[in-house]
Amino acid sequence: MSHDANTIDSRTHEGELNKLGFWIFLTAEFALFGTLFATLLTLQHGGGYGGKLTTDLFELHLILIMTFALLISSYTCGIAIYYMRQEKQNLMMFWMIITVILGLVFVGFEIYEFAHYASEGVNPTIGSFWSSFFILLGTHGAHVSLGIVWVICLLIQIGTRGLDSYNAPKLFIVSLYWHFLDVVWVFIFTAVYMIGMVYSG
């Protein structure tokens, strides 16, 4: 989807400044998740597991459901932004609602995953690896939850006052945020789950 200076999200100077500010904010987010990843990867090789190994606990089908839900939501979010730039409000809202639903599916399964680990006696206190695991996954899950609330608030605003050059940049910014979280999840899926299914300690 090409960026056009005449699209509804690019018609105001304030909107463009907000986008620039958000890109700067994302650099801090990259630093945050980079630090969490570095910590977990270090502890993945030599950290304490408290006798609870990832090779025994990680469930591929559950992880795949979460992954597909989040990746498909990135696609539906992209479609929503396309329709936003076409100024087709109803179609934009439809695809953003689908995005929210998929996000809720992801969060729901992540809560289930954490509950499953808790039932197996796994918690952040049993070993350094699990502590870093729950911090990384919990931080990402909290960001996804925040993104869902953010989108819902914007959809309410747009539904009330209509799509305009004031709220369109906000919608574009939240789409960047959502895609960023999808990228983070791809790294989690690869570095945490895929490695964890074949190696512990």
Swiss-Prot record:
Query: This protein's superkingdom?
Result: Bacteria
Subcellular location(s) per record? Cell membrane
User: What InterPro entries has UniProt attached to this entry?
Assistant: Cyt_c/ubiquinol_Oxase_su3, Cyt_c_oxidase-like_su3, Cyt_c_oxidase_su3-like_sf, Cyt_c_oxidase_su3_a-hlx, QoxC, Ubiquinol_oxase_su3_dom
Does Hydrolase show up as a keyword for this record? no
- A GO cellular component annotation in the UniProt record: plasma membrane
Membrane topology of this protein = Multi-pass membrane protein
Q: What Gene Ontology terms for biological process does this UniProt record contain?
A: aerobic electron transport chain; ATP synthesis coupled electron transport
Query: What would be an example GO MF term here?
Result: cytochrome-c oxidase activity
What's one Pfam family the UniProt record gives for this protein?
COX3
The broad enzyme category this protein falls into is oxidoreductase
Transmembrane annotation, as ranges: 20-40, 62-82, 91-111, 133-153, 172-192
Sorted keywords for this record are: Cell membrane, Membrane, Oxidoreductase, Transmembrane, Transmembrane helix
List, alphabetically, the PROSITE patterns matched: COX3
Q: Give the family per the record.
A: Belongs to the cytochrome c oxidase subunit 3 family.
Q: Which PANTHER family match?
A: CYTOCHROME BO(3) UBIQUINOL OXIDASE SUBUNIT 3, CYTOCHROME C OXIDASE SUBUNIT III
What does this protein do, in the record's words? Catalyzes quinol oxidation with the concomitant reduction of oxygen to water.
Q: What name does UniProt use for this protein?
A: Probable quinol oxidase subunit 3
Q: What is the lineage of its organism?
A: Bacteria, Bacillati, Bacillota, Bacilli, Bacillales
